[in-house]
């Protein structure tokens, strides 16, 4: 093993890359776990934009937003991705309409695994994988899904999945957490009267260097994620 290859996510406006050890190792399977509105999606959006700005290609599968809503959301954070969508560097796949009608679908995850175009990019993001698993009517074996993700990351690709723990049984969560090379938990907390987001790095198997275990951030219009110095015990 030579020096670990890192995918760069640096942006001049924040120092998130330094907080996580300088970049994201190729071959990472990152799980961002947290309840509703704790900052999982915005963290994915920041990472996606960071990868794109550093010339990596990204597939973004969303159970949350239509394409237009995603473009608006990214623009509101000043993470403009219009050109990246047009050039094909960013492939955005909204599966929201499929989930919105509340009917469980057969073979939902099978389709996710069989759509080759998703995995042609350098980075593949599923926001959220828990919604995809919870909305699949067929007997999906999450072990199989994680084994499949491992085969993809073995090709030096990076997969990032968000998980709302309320959507899945503990047995499934355990499989997902165990499979992750990096596990981040997002939380909300109050600090000096302000609501802040906290990203706790609980596991980082391939950490390239020293990293900050507790990253405090807030979401600001036109700035995106603003990482704070504030430390949390």
Swiss-Prot record:
SUPFAM superfamilies named in the record: P-loop containing nucleoside triphosphate hydrolases
Any Pfam family: ATPase
Protein origin, superkingdom: Archaea
Binding site for ATP: 38, 40-42, 64, 196
Keyword Chloroplast: no
Role, per record: Component of the archaellum.
Name this polypeptide is given: Archaeal flagellar ATP-binding protein FlaH
Organism: Methanocaldococcus jannaschii (strain ATCC 43067 / DSM 2661 / JAL-1 / JCM 10045 / NBRC 100440)
Lineage: Archaea, Methanobacteriati, Methanobacteriota, Methanomada group, Methanococci
Gene, per the UniProt record: flaH
């Amino acid at each position: 093993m030579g020096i670990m290859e890192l995918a760069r996510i640096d942006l001049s406006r924040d120092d998130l890359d330094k907080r996580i050890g300088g970049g994201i190792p190729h071959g990472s399977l990152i799980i961002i776990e947290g309840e509703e509105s704790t900052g999982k999606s915005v963290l994915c959006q920041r990472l996606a934009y960071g990868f794109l700005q550093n010339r990596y290609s990204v597939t973004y599968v969303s159970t949350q937003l239509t394409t237009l809503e995603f473009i608006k959301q990214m623009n509101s954070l000043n993470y403009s991705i219009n050109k990246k969508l047009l050039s094909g560097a960013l492939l955005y796949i909204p599966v929201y309409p499929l989930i919105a009608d509340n009917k469980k679908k057969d073979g939902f995850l099978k389709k996710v695994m069989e759509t080759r175009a998703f995995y042609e990019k350098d980075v593949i993001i599923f926001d959220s994988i828990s919604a995809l698993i919870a909305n699949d009517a067929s007997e999906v074996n999450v072990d199989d899904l994680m084994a499949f993700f491992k085969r993809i990351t073995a090709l030096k690709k990076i997969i990032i999945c968000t998980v709302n723990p309320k959507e899945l049984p503990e047995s499934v969560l355990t499989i997902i957490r165990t499979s992750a090379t990096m596990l981040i938990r997002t939380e909300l907390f109050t600090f000096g009267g302000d609501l802040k987001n906290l990203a706790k790095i609980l596991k980082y198997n391939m950490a390239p260097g020293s990293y900050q275990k507790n990253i405090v951030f807030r979401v600001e219009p036109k700035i995106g994620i603003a990482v704070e110095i504030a430390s949390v015990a």
